[in-house]
């Protein structure tokens, strides 16, 4: 028999405070002046008697009961004791499984919030030791942090006792679980996770969070994707927060004041005493998705991370795309990076599984989650060769598709490349130079001659070694092999270890018998069947100046001149250091040979990534990233062989370090004029605030480089001004719409390293993009 004995007390309220192996209950006396306000903590694994003004009551094990206030209580048997006013004692063992609270269509004014504390089911929410929360929302606020759902202790002195799910105005999603920081503070977040605006309208996002005691794990989802996971040694949840008394939408009540105010609409919120599956949460949050992922974590590339978009519509109507498949997080080279490729046969609606046309196999290609903590996020793969920064280009006369990328030898990137071309001049011809692995680091006594035969340059005689079309090494006609490397983390230390897997030995690999000079190279392949098959690898950068540290591609697309004296010429943007920042290579024989031209005499080493458009007479304009906080324009009237001085593009803002941009010609007329379309972030503080500008081409009546001017008439915002926007690539789709493949995050921010599925593909009609520039 259970008993509770008390005489003439106004209210007794019981609530779960914490759960270890057994629940602990608080018994609150909120009474008349005679008894005062007192709180008693009774551990239910012992029968206790506490005195209240010399009166006593017992709380016994397994008391989970509703208590109703009544005068002159007498001893009752059983598990329910009646008082006259309802209060609740709850442990997780009595919380019903499944959905325990749901609300829909709640409009919230920022700073007001919406209190759920008295809603049916809220008493269960306050005692959860596991669960799932799903919330859809549309924010109208620009507050930096906005709580969507919070559960906590709102009384004075308890400001750090709460759990909340929040968003930021930069697109971050996160959660905090706190019971004063010295006792408990778990945080989990993912930047660049949600959006604010899509096609000129504020939009809903759907977020899910689950707390799983079985795996000691927390997960966050949004818009169809698993964003982040936190594994803990000691699992905690709502029931571990002292004195929970508040459930709130649209803010977190701290010391009686609403903090982190959200303004907008909560479309729906559901709280479960149940751990829903990842698949179910991806499906439910996928109700709000915007754009597509052509390349995504877990696809056929086996990469978790993608950067550097390239997008091109072919003359046949096929749309092709390329990107870096980055296996070592989102780091640049040096790293393990290949070039992924995909194509669409229906105008960009659906995309084929990606393939890898440019790939080194010295390091395994695998899905690995790169750490994002303050130490691990900076760790890079040290020994791998890599391809980086793709460029796509079609020769419309031959229908040949080219793909270019920078080729980096093992352990090399632009930052640590050696000055020099990587070639030597022998009898008036340039040959790639090689070092025998046992020779000194500066001794390059060998070269690759005709038919891939390796010569000893000291004797000028052929050796028994040669390379094939992909620079793999052979001896006496037999392919040489080396062991492939794997990479795994032990804490924040990256271990690069030799495996038992044999791969073809390549002169770009660190374990090759012959090694190329450790600088940057320009790689090219071509396809005559729209990317179904590819040619052998061609290294085309023998023209790299000897005083250049690096000569690399301006990623995006190349250009073929379609009219005028230089009709048919192929041209690809480059940039360098220590010689000229901006440069180009061009071909007049359909890509058989290439010539290099420097477009300036600057030597500050700024990243002058450029893209090219054609004027109505066949002259060219190139728009480029600079290191001076502006986007620049240069003009060529001789097919790209020489270029004008830089002119600043007005009213476009960029950071001091700049960002790659995309610019294309539009085939039709806009407002009766030929036009170009440009994509870039528009901010001087970060890679944020993506814009698409439409520029009308005006004939000034002048001649030479001043013949055409650009009237930047329209400007479309891809998302709100705080949302990340980095590298991008535009194309005109077969139906006349504009396709955009872009990095939807701030790729410069160290806080946004190693994010999955940030390469987004979206389409727009010209009418959607025609938003007049506001003065």
Residue map of PLM features:
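Low-complexity, glycine/proline/serine-rich flexible segments
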Residues: 75-128
């Amino acid at each position: 028999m259970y008993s509770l004995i008390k005489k003439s007390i106004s209210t007794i309220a019981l609530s779960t405070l914490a759960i270890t192996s057994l629940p602990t209950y608080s018994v609150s006396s909120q009474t008349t002046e005679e008894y005062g306000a007192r709180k008693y903590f009774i551990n239910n694994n012992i029968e206790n008697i506490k005195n209240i003004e010399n009166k006593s009551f017992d709380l016994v094990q397994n008391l989970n009961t509703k208590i109703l206030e009544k005068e002159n209580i007498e001893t009752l048997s059983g598990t329910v004791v009646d008082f006259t006013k309802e209060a609740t004692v709850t442990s997780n063992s009595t919380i019903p499984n499944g959905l325990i609270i749901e609300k829909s269509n709640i409009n919230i004014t920022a700073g007001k919030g919406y209190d759920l504390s008295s809603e049916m089911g809220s008493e269960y929410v306050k005692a959860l030791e596991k669960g799932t929360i799903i919330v859809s929302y549309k924010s109208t606020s620009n507050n930096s942090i906005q709580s969507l759902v919070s559960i906590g202790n709102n009384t004075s002195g308890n400001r750090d006792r709460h759990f909340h799910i929040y968003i930021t105005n930069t697109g971050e999603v996160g959660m905090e679980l706190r019971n004063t920081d010295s006792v408990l503070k778990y945080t989990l977040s993912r930047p660049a996770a949600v959006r604010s605006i899509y096609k000129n309208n504020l939009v809903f996002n759907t977020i899910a969070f689950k707390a799983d005691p079985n795996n000691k794990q927390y997960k966050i989802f949004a818009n169809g994707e698993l964003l982040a996971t936190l594994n803990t040694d000691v699992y905690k949840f709502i029931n571990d927060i002292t004195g929970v008394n508040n459930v709130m939408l649209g803010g977190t009540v701290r010391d009686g004041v609403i903090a982190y105010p959200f303004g907008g609409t909560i479309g729906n919120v559901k709280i479960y005493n149940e751990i829903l599956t990842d698949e179910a949460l991806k499906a439910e949050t996928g109700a709000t998705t915007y754009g597509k992922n052509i390349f995504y974590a877990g696809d056929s590339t086996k990469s978790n991370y993608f950067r550097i978009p390239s997008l091109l519509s072919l003359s046949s109507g096929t749309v092709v795309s390329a990107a870096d498949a980055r296996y070592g997080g989102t780091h640049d080279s040096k790293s393990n990076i290949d070039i992924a490729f995909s194509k669409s046969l229906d105008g960009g609606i659906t995309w084929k599984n990606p393939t890898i046309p440019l790939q080194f196999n010295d390091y395994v290609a695998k899905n690995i989650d790169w750490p994002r903590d303050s130490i691990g996020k900076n760790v890079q793969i040290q020994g791998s060769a890599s391809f980086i920064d793709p460029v796509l280009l079609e020769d419309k006369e031959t229908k040949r598709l080219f793909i270019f990328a920078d080729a980096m030898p093992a352990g090399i990137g632009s930052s640590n490349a050696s000055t020099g071309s990587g070639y030597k001049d022998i009898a008036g011809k340039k040959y790639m130079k090689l070092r025998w692995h046992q020779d000194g680091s500066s001794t390059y006594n060998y070269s690759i001659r005709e038919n891939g035969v390796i010569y000893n340059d000291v004797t000028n005689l052929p050796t028994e070694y040669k390379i094939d079309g992909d620079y793999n090494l052979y001896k006496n006609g037999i392919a040489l092999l080396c062991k492939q490397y794997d990479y795994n983390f032990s804490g924040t230390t990256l271990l690069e270890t030799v495996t038992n897997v044999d791969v073809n030995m390549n002169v770009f690999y660190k374990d090759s018998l012959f090694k190329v000079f450790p600088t940057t190279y320009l790689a090219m392949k071509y396809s005559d069947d729209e990317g179904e098959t590819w040619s052998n690898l061609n290294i085309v950068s023998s023209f790299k100046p000897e005083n250049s540290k690096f000569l690399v591609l301006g990623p995006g697309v190349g250009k073929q001149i379609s009219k005028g004296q230089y009709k048919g010429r192929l041209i690809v943007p480059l940039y360098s250091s220590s010689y000229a920042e901006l440069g180009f290579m061009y071909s007049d024989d359909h890509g058989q040979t290439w010539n290099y031209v420097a477009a300036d005499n600057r030597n500050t080493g700024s990243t002058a990534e450029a893209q090219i458009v054609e004027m109505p007479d066949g002259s060219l304009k190139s728009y480029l990233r600079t290191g001076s906080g502006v986007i620049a324009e240069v003009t060529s009237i001789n097919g790209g062989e020489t270029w004008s001085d830089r002119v600043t593009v007005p009213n476009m803002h960029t950071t001091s370090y700049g960002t790659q941009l995309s610019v294309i010609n539009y085939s039709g007329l806009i407002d009766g004029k030929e036009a170009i379309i440009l994509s870039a972030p528009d901010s001087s503080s970060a890679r944020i605030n993506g814009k698409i500008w439409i520029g009308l081409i005006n004939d000034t009546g002048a001649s030479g480089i001043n013949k055409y001017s650009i009237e930047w008439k329209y400007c479309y915002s891809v998302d709100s001004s705080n949302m990340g926007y980095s590298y991008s690539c535009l194309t005109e789709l077969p139906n006349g719409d504009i396709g955009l493949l872009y990095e939807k995050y701030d790729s410069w921010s160290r806080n946004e390293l190693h994010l999955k599925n940030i390469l987004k593909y979206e389409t727009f009609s010209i009418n959607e993009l025609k938003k007049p520039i506001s003065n």
